[in-house]
């Protein structure tokens, strides 16, 4: 029913565009995404399908900087994936508990430092994990590499002015469970705020951005 409703809504937007010439296709795209977010909002204040502009791992330099199989990165990730949240939460929420522990450790200890003037420097995780400092690029690369080194699926989202990590936390059927896990493990940080997910092919991805205090 939701698909049928969205289909007619899209047809309606195209009809609107033919009547109002100033409405661009990009505007329709944005309206469509906004409609999806509104249509899938639920009482848990979850904003589902957060549209992302940019590409995933298309920058070769980002690929080269990733080190998910490096022994030091693996040791770092294992240690800090168990630093927070008792085993009872692992039994309750599963492997996402480890991902959230990593997020919390890196987020709490990271200090923002700009790149050298006129240069976009990508720090490898083996460097970043010692410094615990750098810009959003370095943070995203360390976060993604750490998640991947403990068996998680992560991707780096590249936009013109920002870079951040998204982590796969299940499928769309797990939406309520993951939302509950985030609110349980980050109660003070979330408070009454929304949790933002991104759906891709039925899979559920959550933002592990430096600018957010919780996933």
Predicted segments, located by residue:
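Ser/Thr/Pro/Gly-rich low-complexity linker/stalk segments immediately outside membranes or between
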Residues: 19-40
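Pepsin/retropepsin-fold aspartyl endopeptidases
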Residues: 33-50, 66-88, 143, 186-196, ...
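Pro/Ser/Thr/Gly-rich intrinsically disordered low-complexity regions
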Residues: 22-29, 51-54, 67-69
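Secondary-structure boundary elements
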Residues: 55-131
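Hydrophobic membrane-insertion alpha-helices, especially the h-region
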Residues: 2-17
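Hydrophobic/aromatic-rich core segments of domains that either
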Residues: 138-215
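Active-site-adjacent structural elements in enzyme catalytic domains
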Residues: 85-109, 132, 138-141, 145, ...
